[in-house]
UniProtKB/Swiss-Prot annotation:
Cross-referenced Gene3D superfamilies: Ubiquinol-cytochrome C reductase hinge domain
GO (cellular component) term, any one: respiratory chain complex III
Function, as annotated: Component of the ubiquinol-cytochrome c oxidoreductase, a multisubunit transmembrane complex that is part of the mitochondrial electron transport chain which drives oxidative phosphorylation.
Protein name: Cytochrome b-c1 complex subunit 6, mitochondrial
Encoding gene (name): qcr6
Residue ranges with Low complexity bias: 18-37
Subunit structure: Component of the ubiquinol-cytochrome c oxidoreductase (cytochrome b-c1 complex, complex III, CIII), a multisubunit enzyme composed of 10 subunits. The complex is composed of 3 respiratory subunits cytochrome b (cob), cytochrome c1 (cyt-1) and Rieske protein (fes-1), 2 core protein subunits pep and ucr-1, and 5 low-molecular weight protein subunits qcr6, qcr7, qcr8, qcr9 and probably NCU16844/qcr10.
Gene Ontology biological process: mitochondrial electron transport, ubiquinol to cytochrome c
Ranges where the record places region Disordered: 18-94
Length: 141
């Protein structure tokens, strides 16, 4: 296959007016009597299969519950707890005070107030992160 044959094949495949031919359907003999017997067999088989998974479902549910219990026993992220302690510490008290005042102003003003407390929130988070970082590194070492 040459270079131009490959290019031509790509162009033929990409053109929207390319001819697409489907495969012919498989020839199946139409028999009425065996078809009714096979449907009876399949309904009996499906009923048996439907009852079997019902017995397996409680086992699967029990396994899922055990996995959920194992997930609950996982270690709590120390970063979250350290940041919470720092937010409530003396070091971040001014930032927390400003954020709490802003939150009270915004919630008390209702829908007319266009102020938000994003800046105060970021100051509080920054303070908590800066406070918690050295403590976190010490616990991870």
């Amino acid at each position: 296959m040459g270079f131009w044959d490959a290019v031509t094949d790509l162009i033929d495949a990409a053109t929207p007016w390319a001819t697409v031919e489907a495969e012919a359907p498989a020839d199946t003999p139409a028999e009425t009597a065996p078809a009714s017997e096979s449907t009876e067999e399949t309904t009996a088989e499906t009923k048996a299969e439907e009852s079997a998974p019902a017995a397996e479902e409680p086992e699967e549910e029990a396994e899922e519950e055990e996995e959920e219990e194992e997930d609950e026993d996982e270690i709590v992220d120390p970063k979250e707890t350290l940041e919470e302690e720092c937010r409530n510490s003396k070091e971040c008290a001014p930032a927390k005070h400003h954020y709490d005042e802003c939150a009270a102003r915004v919630t008390g003003a209702g829908a007319d107030n266009k102020e938000d407390c994003v800046e105060e929130f970021f100051h509080l988070v920054h303070c908590a992160t800066q406070c918690a970082a050295p403590k976190l590194w010490n616990t991870l070492k």
